[in-house]
């Protein structure tokens, strides 16, 4: 992607991955109501410009809707799976204060994030074998340089048990 436009660093993977807001699974929709002018909505505008891309990257299951110039004061509304709505007033807050506030009320705890990362690393460890939904590889024959499965490619006769038993019987 070309590095053109307003603040193109926002579109790099490093920047997108550096966001620290990971919502709980119960958050389904996030709406941001803000104005494009006025001093009171400056934090909300910066939040939309700098932090919304990071939140979208870290939370792909959350639908994010932006409403411009439809409200006298900026606010965020979260729709939860249970049907509840959480309303957050962001009128006089800076973008970092907004991020910290929503991280505190609707974000996952640090311990939970660490546990999920550890589980993900264990699940996709290259030394684990099993069904695809649990492991990276189903069989040892998928590792490059290993002997293929006898069901797919017949083994050389020197590697079969019958041949070795026949050799021992003959000598």
From Swiss-Prot:
* Entry coiled-coil feature ranges: none
Extract the Pfam families matched here: L51_S25_CI-B8
InterPro entries membership: Ribosomal_mL43/mS25/NADH_DH (IPR007741), Ribosomal_mS25/mL61 (IPR040049), Thioredoxin-like_sf (IPR036249)
The molecular function GO annotations come to: structural constituent of ribosome
- What keywords were assigned to this record? Mitochondrion, Ribonucleoprotein, Ribosomal protein
Compartmental location: Mitochondrion
The primary site where this protein sits is mitochondrion
Source organism, top-level taxon = Eukaryota
Q: Enumerate the SUPFAM superfamilies for this protein.
A: Thioredoxin-like
User: Cellular component terms, GO, for this chain's entry?
Assistant: mitochondrial small ribosomal subunit; mitochondrion
Family to which the UniProt record says this protein belongs: Belongs to the mitochondrion-specific ribosomal protein mS25 family.
Q: Which PANTHER family match?
A: MITOCHONDRIAL RIBOSOMAL PROTEIN S25, SMALL RIBOSOMAL SUBUNIT PROTEIN MS25
Name by which UniProt lists this protein: Small ribosomal subunit protein mS25
Organism per entry:
Rattus norvegicus (Rat)
């Amino acid at each position: 992607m070309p590095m053109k436009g307003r603040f193109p660093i926002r579109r790099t993977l490093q920047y997108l991955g550096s966001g620290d807001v990971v919502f709980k699974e119960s958050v389904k929709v996030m709406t941001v109501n803000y104005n494009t002018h006025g001093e009171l909505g400056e934090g909300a505008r910066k939040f939309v410009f700098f932090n919304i891309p990071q939140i979208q990257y870290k939370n792909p299951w959350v639908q994010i809707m932006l409403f411009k110039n439809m409200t006298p004061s900026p606010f965020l509304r979260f729709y939860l799976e249970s049907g509840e709505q959480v309303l957050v007033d962001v009128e006089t807050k800076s973008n970092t204060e907004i991020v910290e506030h929503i991280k505190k009320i609707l974000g996952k705890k640090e311990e939970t994030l660490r546990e999920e990362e550890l589980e993900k690393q264990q699940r996709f460890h290259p030394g684990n074998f099993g069904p695809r939904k649990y492991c990276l590889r189903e069989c040892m024959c998928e590792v490059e340089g290993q002997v293929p499965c006898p069901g797919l490619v017949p083994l050389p006769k020197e590697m079969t048990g019958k041949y070795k038993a026949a050799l021992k019987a003959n000598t």
